[in-house]
Amino acid sequence: MPHQQMLILFGLLPVATNISTWWNFGSMLLACTSMQVLTGFFLAVHYTANINLAFSSIVHITRDVPYGWMMQNLHAIGASMFFICIYIHIARGLYYGSYLNKKTWLSGTTLLIMLMATAFFGYVLPWGQMSFWAATVITNLLTAIPYLGTTMTTWLWGGFAINDPTLTRFSALHFILSFGIISLLSLHIMLLHEDGWSNPLGTNSDIDKIPFHPYQTYKDLLMLSLVILMLLMTVSFLPDIFNDPENFSKANPLVTPQHIKPEWYFLFAYGILRSIPNKLGGALALAMSIMILLTAPFTHTSTIRSMTFRPIMQLMFWTLVATFAVITWSATKPVEPPFTVISQIASTIYFLFLIMNPILGWVENKIMKHS
């Protein structure tokens, strides 16, 4: 009976009538989380967290375990789908002013940070060349922290270099953080239902709402079927599209890859890190590239919530999207001119968006007041 009541309550959940397709990505992320946990469990059953056996265990999963290739590809490509959905979800939040639901936005940003940490630890687990060197470069950034940096790095590595204890720790952290994500995700959804959804107009939704079921349910199911179709098409026909060729070789500490880079979904942050020729400055910029999202609810000065009616901010928003793409592209290139200059200009524009947000809001208010 309690389950039936829950279903009835969920079906009767009041939702704004005018929410568009951009509001579907939240439920897509819930589906992605479920798939990642499920496929991750089956991979963990066969995986061995040992530097001599990790790479071989991944080969064993893909070759010998029934449907192991599918589990491995679903988990790896599923992570890329996860980040595509989450970046669209964040962009929608910025565009339509969803960040004004402070608790929901802050819990969501914390969730993003935890998700990025989990994905990073997971990328190290296959113990390929790029896994090893990406781990070396990124964890080395901790040494930039004054006084505590070296101690923290040694503690994280479990020694004075990346070795077997590091892989064991990363495996344990990747496993435990997924449960942290589920907990924080539940909190995020609860806070969302407390504050209520925003809508494309940025107005109060209370005056015009409909039950979640059937309209929104079918809308979500349609989107989910399209996402699953895209995922299965990629897994079946282009399983290695997001993989780095270097990662098909076992980790070798004596051979450095020509160009060290993380997965594509971290390239924007990595590009910002590389654009600053100072270790501490780069590490701070890397942290700020994500942390700056936390400032959005506190720097909103416009009397209008959504960018639907803010043409100047729309221009700034699409500049941010283009900048994100440019930083991602430049991070795949060698550290040499003109790519370093492009990265530096793009990184400056990236941070400028969230600095310009309050200034443009204030300017818009003045224009509307005098018109």
Curated annotation (Swiss-Prot):
CC cofactor: heme b
Source domain of life: Eukaryota
Primary location: mitochondrion
List of residues binding heme b b566: 89, 188
Pfam families membership: Cytochrom_B_C, Cytochrome_B
Keywords attached to this entry: Electron transport, Heme, Iron, Membrane, Metal-binding, Mitochondrion, Mitochondrion inner membrane, Respiratory chain, Transmembrane, Transmembrane helix, Transport, Ubiquinone
Protein name: Cytochrome b
Phylogenetic lineage: Eukaryota, Metazoa, Chordata, Craniata, Vertebrata
